[in-house]
């Protein structure tokens, strides 16, 4: 696995200086170093800005609806400030046994999520939203990936969590 760049301090939308039209044309609406790493592989100039949105799951919302809504809201939140730029928003979650799994945030929750996923089929749903400044339209694409986890024992899960620290990854 390629090592990630050191964590960057990504400004939130409220911490930004006034709009500068000489900046890049593409804005990544995300605080994720993983998404910045992926977009950086395309060797495009872009600016990364953390959107400030409520990421709570709405009642009755499916995993696919949830990630599509968040990707769209992230793109639109940043596009309000930068309406003349292409804005890319994205989100991902996993679903196991009908439960939406977000970022665990803590080691014990990461272990719990992976224990629940052991031997199960898990769907990772990734949504990408692109705001087009010419039309003010947001296009959203969804890619579900189905993974069948082999049975994992507790010590293997703990080793993985302690080594990889997947606390900011949906479903650990």
Locations of regions flagged by a protein language model:
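Extreme N-terminal basic, low-complexity initiation segments
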Residues: 1-10
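Short, Lys/Arg-enriched N-terminal segments with co-localized hydrophobic residues
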Residues: 9-22
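Anionic-ligand binding patches
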Residues: 24-27, 63-172
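A short beta-strand-loop structural module common to alpha/beta enzyme folds
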Residues: 47-55
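N-terminal beta1-alpha1 ligand-phosphate binding loop
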Residues: 23-44
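Cofactor-binding loop segments of dinucleotide-utilizing enzymes, especially the Rossmann-like FAD-
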Residues: 31, 51, 133
């Amino acid at each position: 696995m390629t090592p990630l760049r050191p964590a960057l301090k990504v400004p939130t939308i409220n911490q930004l200086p006034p709009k500068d039209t000489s900046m890049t044309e593409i804005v990544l609406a995300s605080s994720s170093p993983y998404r910045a790493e992926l977009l950086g592989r395309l060797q495009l100039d872009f600016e990364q800005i953390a959107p400030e949105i409520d990421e709570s799951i709405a009642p009755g919302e499916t995993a696919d609806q949830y990630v599509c809504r968040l990707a769209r809201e992230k793109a639109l939140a940043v596009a309000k400030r930068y309406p003349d730029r292409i804005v890319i928003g994205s989100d991902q979650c996993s679903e196991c046994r009908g439960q939406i799994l977000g970022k665990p945030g803590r080691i014990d929750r990461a272990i719990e999520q992976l224990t629940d996923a052991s031997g199960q089929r898990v769907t990772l749903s990734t949504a990408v939203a692109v705001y087009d400044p010419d039309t003010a339209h947001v296009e959203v694409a969804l890619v579900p990936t189905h993974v069948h986890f082999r049975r994992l024992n507790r010590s293997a899960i703990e080793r993985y969590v302690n080594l990889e620290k997947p606390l900011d990854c949906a479903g650990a």
